[in-house]
Structure formats: structure tokens, C-alpha cells
Amino acid sequence: MYRYKITIEYLGTNLAGWQRQAGVISVQQILEEAIYKFSGEQVILFGSGRTDAGVHAIGQVAHFDLSKHLEPHKIITAINYFARPYAVGVWNCELASNNFHARFSATSRHYIYRIINRPYPSVIDLNRAWWISSPLDVLTMQKAAAYLLGKHDFTSFRASSCQSKSPIKTLTELNIIKEDEEIKLYLSAPSFLHHMVRNIVGSLVLVGKNVWQAEQIKDVLEAKDRKAAGPTAPASGLYFVKTEY
């Protein structure tokens, strides 16, 4: 068997997320069907992260096995031919060791969350960012973010449906940068809980609006209670940008 590692980008707006589900269109389904159409082989695609409906990706990584050797550039061309109508594309493909696993071999995952912060919405960024009309205090948001860096129990920021065995995660990066009318939050960790990024963003926005003081983020973290945190930020602003191995 030959194992192939692919890097994928997609607009998640009209998709049900990464994972194959009955009755809806998912990224996994689109790619598995595309691979079958050119290879004639039924494959199971393993992704480095399971993005939710509406979440986008720039650097999602996945792997699959084929019984025959194919040139990587031909795989890219073939997958993109069948997947492009769904705003899903592959931009890299390479042979990988049979010991490689897109999910379990990963050492770090990186996300960006985009906020358009101006009085009027952006037509160009419709469904590609969270529009917030009231001014956000980025400096105070960054101060609050510092409380979340490092290894913590992130129960307050996990979805009630989260299936992770442990709420303990290590946040290695949480930077907030304002560029003109756009605010970008950069988050990195070896792995994340379900909705963890979006719940952190929703809470930091309350700080940015001066609804909360920066220090309240520490209290939320220590509460270990989802009800203590802010709302879940919209999926449209979230981008899965990179996986490291």
C-alpha cells in the first residue's frame, strides 16, 4: 500500500464540516468520492482536525492509502477536477511513511480567527469573518489572552458535546493583531477541544467591548464551567491554517 499525504484548503460556508455525515455534504465525503472517481479505490481519509460546519481551512492535512503508485501532481490535478465545484482543493501531495498519521502524528495545530471591526459590514468578507460594529479594545484583549497561555483545564471553553477524554490543553500561542479594520487572533496548540477556539474568541470579544475586565478571563478559566465563558464566536471567522509534524 502507498500512503499519500495531502494538504487541503476549503471554504466551509456551504459544507457540513470535515467529518462525513449522513444526509449532508462534508469535506471528507467530497475528497473520498473524488479519489474514488480517479483511482477506482474506496478510501478512508484521515484528517488532522475536524472542522465544524462553516469553518474554513488553508492548511488542513489528511492521508489515505492506495494499492498503486500514482504521481503526486496527478493526484492533485485529479482531486481538484472533481472537488472544485464544492470550493474544496488540494495544493500539495506527497508520499508518506506508512507510520505517518495525519491526526496522531501532529505536534501542533494553528488557527486564525478574523474579525472585521468597523461600523458597516464587509460584503467581500461575508461568511469569511465575524463583523463587529462596535470598537474593540485590542490591548485589553491581549492582556486577557495572556491568562490563557500555557497548560490549563479548559473546561470553561469546551463545547458541552466535546468528546475529548481530558480538558487539559496547552495553548502555546494567542496573539491578537489589529490591521486597519481587521483584527486577527492567532492560536496554536498541540490539540484543541471542540469549540475551544471559538469560545475563547467569544469571551475575549466581551473583554474588547469592555463588558468584562481582562482579569475576568482568569476567573472564567478557573470556574471550569462552560456557562461562565462568553458566547461561541461564529464559525465563519475561523480558519485552520497549518498542522506541524
UniProtKB/Swiss-Prot annotation:
CDD domains linked to this entry: PseudoU_synth_EcTruA
Active site: 52
Segments forming a coiled coil: none
One GO BP annotation of this record: tRNA pseudouridine synthesis
Record-listed substrate binding positions: 111
InterPro entries, sorted: PsdUridine_synth_cat_dom_sf, PsdUridine_synth_TruA, PsdUridine_synth_TruA_a/b_dom, PsdUridine_synth_TruA_C, TruA/RsuA/RluB/E/F_N
GO molecular function terms noted in the UniProt entry: RNA binding; tRNA pseudouridine(38-40) synthase activity
Catalytic activity reported: uridine(38/39/40) in tRNA = pseudouridine(38/39/40) in tRNA
This protein's record includes keyword Isomerase: yes
TM regions (residue ranges): none
SUPFAM superfamilies noted in UniProt: Pseudouridine synthase (SSF55120)
Residues in the signal sequence: none
Assigned EC number: 5.4.99.12
Gene3D superfamilies, sorted: Pseudouridine synthase I, catalytic domain, C-terminal subdomain (3.30.70.660), Pseudouridine synthase I, catalytic domain, N-terminal subdomain (3.30.70.580)
Keywords: Isomerase, tRNA processing
UniProt function note: Formation of pseudouridine at positions 38, 39 and 40 in the anticodon stem and loop of transfer RNAs.
Annotated family: Belongs to the tRNA pseudouridine synthase TruA family.
Subunit field text: Homodimer.
PANTHER family: PSEUDOURIDYLATE SYNTHASE (PTHR11142), TRNA PSEUDOURIDINE SYNTHASE-LIKE 1 (PTHR11142:SF0)
Protein name: tRNA pseudouridine synthase A
